Amino acid sequence: MFIVGIDVAKRSHEVCMITSDGQTVQRPFSIRNNCTGYNLMLEKIRKHTNIKSQIVFAMESTAHYWLALFTRLRKDGYHVILLNPIQTSAMRDMFIRKIKTDAKDSFIIAELIRFG
């Protein structure tokens, strides 16, 4: 299984992809919050798998910025998990280095799903 963590924002999203055993298969990358960005994200993910049932997307419910991406992924048949920002904040606090970057947040979102 592949877990795609997405840190959503107004203009761009940070995306990270890991396996269910924690291996990073796609280093964090940025996409624009538009159709071109969406297609770029899927293109990078498809390099690792084309099977939708092997992919779990996860993102925070940050303001309303998550809604378009969440809706499009669900419409396209992907499994998407929406997280409360309090959950990711608690997970971030578990790491020794308290670094907050969008790339790190996308990884933490993916890890949160991996750990259940």
What are these regions (language model features)?
Residues M1-G116:
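Phosphate- and other anionic-substrate recognition elements at nucleic-acid/protein interfaces
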